[in-house]
A protein has these predicted regions:
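Catalytic core of pol beta-like nucleotidyltransferases
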Residues: 1-30, 41-47, 58-122
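Short beta-strand->loop micro-motif that forms the acidic, two-metal-ion catalytic signature
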Residues: 52-56
Length: 122
């Protein structure tokens, strides 16, 4: 996974920082990792590209579903604010790790992704 320092565009960094702040407020200490993936992570975006971000949390699947209204609100508010569609996907961290070696989708996120936030584990 790549580091956030690979991004030089200040406007885009401001968007990512805003996403990080809003998602952190929603999930609190349950937030484990935020990862930018897709065309923006590969630096292949065009004017029609959305911003894809995976939210990985320390929560069980049932409780994670309860965060959906908050996620939709963040996506709507920030997409309107920045005039760019921001797509937020959420998964439990344990599910992501369990299927990382199996699912190409998760492998692409890991290999091409840029970590926006990562909780340090002691």
């Amino acid at each position: 996974m790549k580091s956030l320092e690979t991004i030089k565009d200040k406007r885009f960094l401001a968007i990512l920082f805003d996403v990080k702040e809003k998602v952190s407020e929603l999930f609190g200490d349950k937030l484990r990792q935020l990862v930018l993936y897709g065309s923006y992570a590969r630096d292949e975006q065009d004017p029609e590209s959305d911003i894809d971000i995976m939210i990985l949390v320390d929560e069980n699947e049932d409780k994670l579903q309860g965060y959906r209204p908050g996620i939709v609100e963040i996506m709507t508010d920030l997409s309107l604010k920045y005039d760019t569609f921001i797509s937020l996907s959420r998964k439990t961290y344990s599910h992501y790790i369990e299927y990382l070696d199996i699912l190409p989708y998760y492998q692409n996120i890991y290999n091409e992704g840029i970590e926006i936030y990562g909780k340090k584990i002691a």
